[in-house]
Amino acid sequence: MLIQADDETLLECLVMNADPEHDADFYEFDLKTVTEYRKKMLSAPVKDGKAVLEELTGQRKEEAEDDDLDWEEEVLGEMEGGEPNDRFANYWNDDTGMTYPLILAKIPVKNPWEIFAYLPFGNWNECPDTPDLMAVAKYWFEQHGAIPAAMSHDELEFELPTPISKERAMEVAVEQYGFCPDLDQNEDGSIGSLADVLWQSTVWYFWWD
């Protein structure tokens, strides 16, 4: 897992989830408490990732209805205008053209979705909590071979061995929009244009506001 080494907000998020008593002074986290949290997450049954995504997508549809948006025409749109994405983005500094300081972390897990028990960065705004992150990551790994590979405090990127099929691209794009409604991977912001990215790409990018 690639992690931004100087991202204090990421450290704050990790401590907030694993040792909430020390979230105000996250450099003083209690190792025993963090270890117990990790064990708890790893020992719990993993939720049904497909069901989690269906619930989140249902929330997005309700939000669209509340905003008087037509789901098919204004949210889904046409599958067009996408560009391939085969490069991680979150650790690049646009001002310098170089990467931020990085940690290449070897996480001692048997399964890739268990990474979030060690790095519980979510559970704020629309970013899912650890059980949901683990469930969705398990489902996407089993379906597509997707592995969590790069992280900052508000970004997450998965790497795939090969792009998904064009036939499944819209289905997966809807799942990703449910998972991350702040997706900003394309010019018009429609799920269709995201789908046109996915069938050409081996990197999935997520960003939460």
PLM regions and their residue ranges:
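A generic structural signal for short, non-catalytic loop/turn and secondary-structure boundary residues
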Residues: D95-Y100, F141, M151, V197-S201
